[in-house]
């Protein structure tokens, strides 16, 4: 027997079967860097319509975690897919570089400013630390395969950016949004600074819950309000609180104007409570016997005065809409210096905003003899003892509740009234304009709109001042005596002068500045404001300080912001406030949020649990493309589960896609698209169908990319590779591809289809599996640009027309029939027919309502190649098909497959069984078809 292996067109490619991504990817990255791939893309896209995804800056502190990876990969997928969609989509990564966490790290290593070195030296060390953190994170982000201007990122500590942050504040001042006030703000006693809303986390805390009686100053007046002048015993108004330490700052008691308040007789005294809460309060304080003497509306009690239990003054009853019946007594202890609602109502009534607590959380001297110098969280017991001594404590118990804590220290925080600078939400209509702008933004998922609308509608004024060392200075001057801001025009001119200096020397220029250099003779009357800006102002102003300033953005506003769902109250909020305050419009057109990562059991990632997944470990073991594929295949709108098992599944999916690509490349061996391409109208019908499959898949994949629906992209890609190609087309074409004449139309038609499919597939993969797409690109035949990322989606796809005889609907029926035939072939393995080519299939049918069988008959001899059997016979059953046999419906056609052993001998070249093996003397051991393909004109294929 001759060896016919040399006569076959066996697949061959240098594209490896195994990805070995962890080993190969670093080399590809080095090439990308050496070639300046990002610069090549920018040059290729110059002049195209822009799409700007503005990077929300991660904090320059610590190594990147899996959440960082999700965020950067999602951004990169969008930027690359937009590039392939014909956009110029520059990506400038950024970092948030000022603020407390960096200060704390530097303090831990070197000590606090003023102890061993000056504030200026401390800032220099903070800048140095932030720079090292940026370098570390940048390497990991690049390793993820994220393309961007990594050589020129934006840093909020860049001198020019610092200067522009000051200019942004100047514009906000010019537009009338800044004001100064002693308002209660979130205050961390460990940070000794105000905190932004986004820096507050909530944890369970056990606190004392107390009911306190404030005795009426004019007993008769109160009794008269209830129409009960003869009531015996003293009358008190009862408040309930879980923060006894705030009682020294009490300046009023708030009631709801429309609630009914009851005068209740207990144990020789009368107390006033909300009528609906009487029963629960009586149970709580253990009053078994009580009598409701009368009721009045809260409005009737307004401005009646009650004696503070131990502070030696009396306070008014006032009316407020913030009073509820959810808990307590219906009478709210009101300390304007310790709560935003209290402050607002206090302003309405002209109450003192008392602030008896220092920045360290201890009571200031002169507060109360037994409280002076005591930390507020240690003062609750002292206050409770005071109330007992004064006979004002009705009840005390322990209560667990959610309490605000510092995001950095995880310790409880307080509301503390301090002189601060605020961006007003209402003075110049910022709240209403922001709500209007929100409606013009596309929120993805759409529930993001309601979430941020609620936050904007209910948020207090934004406290933008901080008492920190490492931050952008507010750059303001105030009068030494009145503390009034320098007149507006001079303030703006002074800020611009400061900004110019900061642009040259950084923020230290402000602290080195002698006011005389700017204010001249007036310098003696004014002093510099020592405060720095909230770091959320730094990042929130980047639509101006970065997007408006970078030349590659060419004056275009950002199209998209993309961050985790916690940023509705963080970066999305601060960016919206600043942009609307400066320009009257939102800084973004689309806002996309992704969920947080959890483990395979849905638990939050935690080092203590030991369920964290390190992106560095994943890249070093599996490769970045596996991590990228996991991100893309996960629905980012909810929690994103990741574990070793989940990543293993992503690796399995990757292998299926890679194997498909390798099959395409291996079978394109020897194909030159410039000379070997077959025209569509001359191609085998099945090949045109396959290209049409790719066309349909591309339409759906591009639609999913456009909708940022990346898990749908992956699902559609997998279906194309595994089902449409792997389970059908690629199996069928192996015979033709391997056995036909090398340069025959039959084979070149197949290669033409594979070429079109590969050109499309590599581009679908590129935004997600970027390294693998780049690797595939290098093995594709034909002239092309150096990188897949510089081009656009493949536009060479075509398909079958609907009015053709063998259209897509026909091939859908064929695929269905083939699935059923394959099941019967599988069943026959038990009867000794081990492979499909050992089989002869007789397809019986009783009717052909939709014409599928008629069309199958028209395929003639080629029908067997579709079913990958040696013989295939179609037989009409006039009397119908026996119901006891296996039967099924293809469209409206009832058919049955009967499998028997194929007739004839096995051809050693094509492995088909035929009755003409050995009929040609020169080739005595192969079939007639193979003889034709070796020595004759070659077989002709029209359909399959």
Swiss-Prot record:
Cofactor: Zn(2+)
Segments crossing the lipid bilayer: none
Motif interval(s): 'HIGH' region: 58-68
Cofactor detail note: Binds 1 zinc ion per subunit.
Subcellular location: Cytoplasm
Binding site for L-isoleucyl-5'-AMP: 563
One GO CC annotation: cytosol
GO terms for MF: aminoacyl-tRNA deacylase activity; ATP binding; isoleucine-tRNA ligase activity; tRNA binding; zinc ion binding
Binding site for ATP: 607
Top EC group: ligase
Assembly description: Monomer.
Family: Belongs to the class-I aminoacyl-tRNA synthetase family. IleS type 1 subfamily.
Protein name per Swiss-Prot or TrEMBL: Isoleucine--tRNA ligase
Organism field: Salmonella enteritidis PT4 (strain P125109)
Gene that this sequence comes from: ileS
